[in-house]
A protein has these predicted regions:
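Metal-cofactor-binding active-site regions of metalloenzymes
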Residues: 1-184, 193-198, 205, 209-210, ...
Length: 329
């Protein structure tokens, strides 16, 4: 769906399509345990978040050089542009690369070779968000932030992702305080598999400005009331929720109920290569299955720009919003 939109919940490593994975494996002499792209695609069947993460980290082995990260980002940007994305705030997971001996500079500089020219090449403005892996230690997160300091002119904010259960936001209080002191924006995954209390903790302890996922807020009327009152955006990922069994079927997704409650919801793709759809595909899926009206779809697109970190360029944001209003379905 080419409705103009911003994508705010997108893991760049999760855009690694099987074809590119094999291309990079051949380039770097990495042997993948799959005969071909078809066999690899069949492996994209997940029972839960952890089974997805196991494959996600396994395939990262093909990402070695600046050129690899540049090619990965450009492949995403080309697909996103074709689906109406005008602005993208892109997550990356440096700890997973540092652990493999890939330096922070290789990752950031490689991504920036694509992001720095994304407006000229793809018509998309971008921001880069460094995510900490919550199943790693708080000390590792602090070390990662320290390693990122030479590149903060290219990093807009920090996030928190990976396995949620058993890793509450409180664990990362210190690194989020350090990030805030550096002037970085703050978001965090919360309330996907973890309980509603993790959402409140992310707000109260980490000071996040957006909640990534946040689906389980619906279990707490008090939390919903707070999110509505404070206009805290939620970056929902419907096809991801189905694939990871957060909801049983798309028809059962609470997005319509959340919108009716006044929550500031956005629709995003999460890890589109693994979950069977980019952001435009997610829009089409919720339109068809959840029967969202054109007004609701326009609201989702409008929310995506309003929830973005474009405060430093209000003229651009206003232009994007006018494109949403002018769009004809």
């Amino acid at each position: 769906m080419p409705l103009p939109k911003a994508e705010l919940h997108l893991h760049i490593e999760g855009t690694l399509e099987p074809e590119l994975a094999f291309e990079l494996a051949a380039r770097n002499g990495v042997e993948l345990p799959y005969a071909d792209t078809g066999e690899l695609r069949k492996a994209y069947q997940f029972e839960d978040l952890q089974s997805f993460l196991n494959l996600y980290y396994e395939l990262m082995a093909v990402l070695r050089t600046e050129r690899d990260f540049e090619d990965l980002a450009n492949a995403y940007l080309a697909r996103a542009a074709a689906q109406g994305v005008r602005h993208a705030e892109i997550f990356f997971d440096p700890q997973a690369h540092l652990a493999r001996g890939v330096p922070m500079g290789t990752v950031v500089e490689g991504l920036w070779r694509a992001l720095g020219s994304s407006e000229a090449n793809h018509g998309i403005s971008t921001r880069l968000i460094l995510c900490f892996l919550r199943d790693e230690s708080a000390e590792s997160a602090l070390q990662t932030l320290e390693a990122a300091k030479p590149y903060l002119d290219r990093i807009t904010g920090v996030g928190l992702d990976s396995a949620e259960v058993g890793h509450p936001p409180m664990k990362f209080r210190e690194v989020y305080e350090a990030a805030a002191a550096l002037g970085l924006r703050r978001v965090a995954h919360a309330g996907e598999e973890g309980p509603p209390e993790y959402i409140a903790e992310a707000l109260d302890v980490l000071g996040v400005e957006r909640v990534d996922h946040g689906l389980r807020c619906m279990e707490s009327p008090e939390l919903v009331e707070r999110l509505v009152r404070d206009r805290i955006p939620l970056t929902l990922c419907p096809l991801s929720n189905v694939r990871l069994r957060t909801v049983d079927t798309l028809a059962e997704h609470p997005l319509p109920t959340m919108l009716d409650a006044g929550l500031v919801c956005t629709v995003n793709s999460d890890d589109p290569a693994y979950f069977g759809g980019y952001v435009g595909d997610n829009f089409e899926a919720v339109q068809g299955t959840l029967r969202l009206t054109e007004d609701r779809l326009r609201e989702l697109a409008r929310n995506s720009f309003l929830a973005s970190f474009l405060e430093d360029d209000e003229e651009r944001r206003a232009r994007y919003l006018s494109e949403v209003e002018a769009y004809e379905f």
